Structure formats: structure tokens, C-alpha cells
């Protein structure tokens, strides 16, 4: 199974905190929200690949985050090419974008990149 983390929003509701920084990379409990999510996913043996879709504005932030990770799952950061709220694809548009770009034809576990949760 593959997993898609949605992180292509422009985080406008948390301005000015997120004006130049993506919401999924804000720290909660000493680490980014997206890292909490990734740690939960590492416990699911069926997940073999993880994609994170973001926009052009925040793409390099996620690349830097990925380069600092110490984990066993490879994450591919995908840039949807959008640069503002005006041309954003939206959640379902980004899902479709990644499915087509990666030719996904198997179950896909989709998670919002700014959602904290517990499986227990």
C-alpha cells in the first residue's frame, strides 16, 4: 500500500505564523506535526511508499525537513507546481495529480499533513 500526505495548502488561517512556513512543519511537542504523522505510519508494515504533495511555495521547506529525517521509510516530496491560493489544486485535485503522476493503481492511504491522531 502507498500513502499520500496532503501538504499543499497555503496555511492562510494561521497567518502571520505561516505566511512563509507550512503548517505541517509547525512544531508540537518539540517536533513538526508531519513528523508525528510519519512516526505513526512507520508502525504500519503494509505501507511501502509515502508521497508528500506540496506546492511550489513550500517545496524547499519539505525537502529540508526530509533531509534531516532518520527513518526507515522513503518519502518522495512532490511539487504540484502551484504558487498561490489562486491556482491551488485543492485536496482532491492534489490526490488526482499524484495518482496520475505516479500511476497509482492500488490502495492509497490519504492523510492530511496537519492532522494529529492516534490509532489506539
Predicted regions and their residues:
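Conserved N-terminal catalytic core of the sugar/cofactor nucleotidyltransferase
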Residues: 2-5, 13, 27, 31-111
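Acidic donor-binding/catalytic loop of UDP-sugar-dependent glycosyltransferases
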Residues: 115-120
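Short alpha-helical oligomerization interface
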Residues: 19-23
Amino acid at each position: 500500500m502507498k500513502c499520500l500526505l496532503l501538504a499543499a495548502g497555503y496555511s492562510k488561517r494561521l497567518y502571520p505564523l505561516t505566511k512563509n512556513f507550512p503548517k505541517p512543519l509547525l512544531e508540537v511537542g518539540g517536533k513538526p506535526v508531519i513528523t508525528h504523522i510519519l512516526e505513526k505510519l512507520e508502525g504500519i508494515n503494509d505501507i511501502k511508499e509515502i508521497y508528500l504533495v506540496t506546492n511550489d511555495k513550500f517545496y524547499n521547506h519539505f525537502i529540508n525537513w526530509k533531509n534531516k529525517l532518520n527513518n526507515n521509510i522513503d518519502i518522495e516530496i512532490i511539487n504540484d507546481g502551484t504558487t498561490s491560493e489562486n491556482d491551488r489544486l485543492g485536496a482532491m485535485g492534489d490526490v488526482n495529480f499524484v495518482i496520475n503522476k505516479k500511476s497509482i493503481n492500488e490502495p492509497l492511504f490519504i492523510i492530511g499533513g496537519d492532522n494529529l491522531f492516534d490509532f489506539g
